[in-house]
């Protein structure tokens, strides 16, 4: 896997496009697999993805290929790849994996970039791979951390974590993704890396909600800090290491997503706090805010495991039970006093 590697990135959204751009800059042979024929043609002709990264020039070495996932056009590409980067939304991942069965080469490495928990089964992507593509569990990795797609695509310095249970594979993947502006660390704590990336989206909606209501920086800092605490509690209950949540895929991603205006989940919270309805917000966004569905999954997991997650529970009440945003934040502040 050293030197030039044949890589396919599945998903032509902002993150998939940014990673294809990054990997092409790193000297690899990169195919970007997407469904829209016109979008693929535009990328190949103009080296730009106008729907998701308008105005950002893409590396000319990217080859965009349109077609159905697992269909003949993409199957031809997948037959020769060493790494497949999965950049599709978490809630669509299981169906995607099923369509890839029998298409992906048996020695291919899967690198997941989705940040979420499946609502129907309450599992992360690693578990989905174990169930749908069991032969690839030992060659599975997850890339997560504070990384807005636009900044990666415009070569801004970025550091992330590659979670991989195989230390040697994790070390090789660090090299594959390395560029002068993109640095990867590796971790064997796959559950921690996946859960940190997923749950921070829930907390980001809460932080945006607080900001949209005009509650100020003190309130945001409190939400972020207490949100990190409950993220760690659930993570440990699910087998993750507490220390992982103090790293890039935990605290780092949480800080960025709760404060950066490029965060889709923060934007959902801001708009809710400003009085918009969730339905109106969702219909106006061309990109997925994973935190809305993840809130439901995390809340149900916390209830199942008996883990105290008041920020998540409050956001569930706002998003799914009609709890007024201002009263929701005030209810958090009015909880019984206790030790930290």
What spans do the regions from the language model cover?
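NAD(P)+-binding Rossmann beta1-loop-alpha1 motif at the extreme N-terminus of oxidoreductases
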Residues: 1-56, 63-67
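A short helix-to-beta-strand connector/capping loop
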Residues: 54-67, 136-138, 180-182, 307
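Rossmann-like NAD(P)(H) cofactor-binding subdomain of soluble oxidoreductases
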Residues: 64-71, 76-157, 173
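Internal alpha-helical scaffold of NAD(P)-dependent oxidoreductase catalytic cores
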Residues: 92, 103, 128-139, 157-205, ...
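General beta-strand structural signal in soluble alpha/beta enzymes
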Residues: 112, 138-144, 184-188, 246-247, ...
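NAD(P)-dependent Rossmann-like dehydrogenase/reductase catalytic/cofactor-binding core
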Residues: 207-211, 236-246, 250-340
């Amino acid at each position: 896997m050293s030197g030039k590697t044949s890589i396919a990135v599945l998903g032509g959204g902002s993150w998939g496009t940014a990673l294809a751009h990054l990997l092409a800059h790193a000297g690899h042979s990169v195919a970007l697999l997407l469904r829209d024929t016109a979008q693929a043609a535009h990328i190949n002709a103009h080296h730009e993805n106008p729907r998701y990264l308008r105005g950002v020039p893409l590396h000319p070495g990217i080859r965009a290929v349109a077609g159905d996932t697992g269909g003949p056009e993409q199957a031809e590409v997948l037959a020769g790849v060493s790494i497949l980067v999965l950049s599709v939304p978490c809630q669509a991942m299981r169906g995607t994996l099923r369509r890839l069965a029998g298409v992906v080469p048996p020695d291919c490495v899967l690198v997941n970039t989705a940040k979420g928990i499946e609502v129907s089964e309450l599992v992360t992507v690693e578990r989905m791979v174990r169930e749908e593509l069991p032969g690839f569990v030992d060659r599975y990795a997850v890339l997560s951390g504070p990384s807005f797609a636009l900044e990666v695509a415009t070569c801004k310095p970025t550091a992330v974590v590659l979670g991989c249970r195989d230390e040697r594979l994790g070390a090789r993947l660090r090299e594959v993704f390395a560029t002068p502006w993109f640095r990867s660390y590796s971790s064997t704590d796959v559950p921690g890396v996946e859960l940190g990336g997923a749950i921070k989206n829930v907390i980001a909606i809460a932080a945006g909600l607080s900001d949209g209501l005009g509650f100020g920086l003190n309130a945001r800092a409190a939400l972020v800090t207490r949100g990190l605490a409950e993220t760690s509690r659930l993570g440990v209950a699910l087998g993750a290491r507490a220390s992982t949540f103090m790293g890039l895929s935990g605290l780092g991603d949480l800080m960025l997503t709760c404060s950066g205006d490029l965060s889709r989940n923060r934007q959902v919270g801001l708009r809710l706090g400003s009085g918009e309805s969730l339905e109106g917000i969702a219909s106006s966004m061309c990109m997925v805010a994973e935190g809305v569905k993840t809130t439901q999954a995390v809340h149900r997991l916390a209830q199942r495991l008996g883990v105290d997650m008041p920020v998540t529970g409050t956001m569930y009440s706002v998003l799914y039970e009609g709890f007024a945003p201002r009263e929701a934040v005030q209810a958090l502040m009015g909880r019984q006093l206790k030790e930290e």
